[in-house]
A protein has these predicted regions:
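A detector of tandem-repeat and repeat-rich interaction/domain scaffolds
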Residues: 2-98
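Terminal amphipathic alpha-helical/low-complexity segments used for targeting or macromolecular assembly
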Residues: 26, 105-160
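Intrinsic disorder/low-structure terminal segments
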Residues: 45, 65, 77, 100-103, ...
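Ampipathic, surface-exposed secondary-structure segments
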Residues: 85-118
């Protein structure tokens, strides 16, 4: 397993690149960022501030992934998009502009952030990955308070 760093890409400030990751096209990886597996960062994209890009994820076209965010599976981030606020973007999500995802904070129990991606209509909450209806059902199974709160977020975001 060898990562490939080429075409004026730069790795700085304790960044980590491993597996079969490909960094090229003047991409910049810095500040404790991790790029691993078969992830690709290219075309002036940047990953920094403890962010992780893994799986087969692709970050390109001046996109930036920052602040403990996680991009994984087959997700694609492009077109100057900025991913921040501990977002977790996975599956087959495509983020082409900043309004293609939302990050919220669970302020009623765990304090954990959770993410909605518009391209695939998926919610990512800790270990949970699924539709709004699946999230509501799981949350009610956990507690009435969680169910009510997640249902409010799903209804707000999905316009129900």
């Amino acid at each position: 397993m060898y990562a490939d760093v080429s075409d004026n890409a730069r790795i700085w400030h304790n960044a980590h690149v491993s597996g079969h990751a490909r960094i090229s096209g003047k991409a910049l990886i810095l500040d404790n960022a991790t790029i691993k597996d078969h992830a690709t960062i290219t075309d002036n994209a940047s990953v920094a501030n403890n962010a992780i890009v893994c799986g087969q994820a692709l970050v390109k076209n001046k996109a930036m992934v920052l602040h403990y965010s996680v991009i994984g599976d087959d997700a694609t981030i492009l077109n100057d998009s900025v991913i921040t606020s501990m977002a977790e973007i996975v599956g087959d999500a495509v983020i082409a502009k900043n309004t293609d995802y939302e990050v919220f904070k669970n302020n009623w129990s765990s304090g954990r952030s959770f993410t909605y991606t518009k391209s695939n209509h998926i919610w990512c909450v800790g270990c949970f990955y699924g539709t709004g209806q699946e999230l509501i059902e799981k949350a009610y199974a956990d507690s009435e308070t969680s169910g009510q709160n997640y249902e409010r977020y799903v209804n707000f975001v999905e316009g129900k």
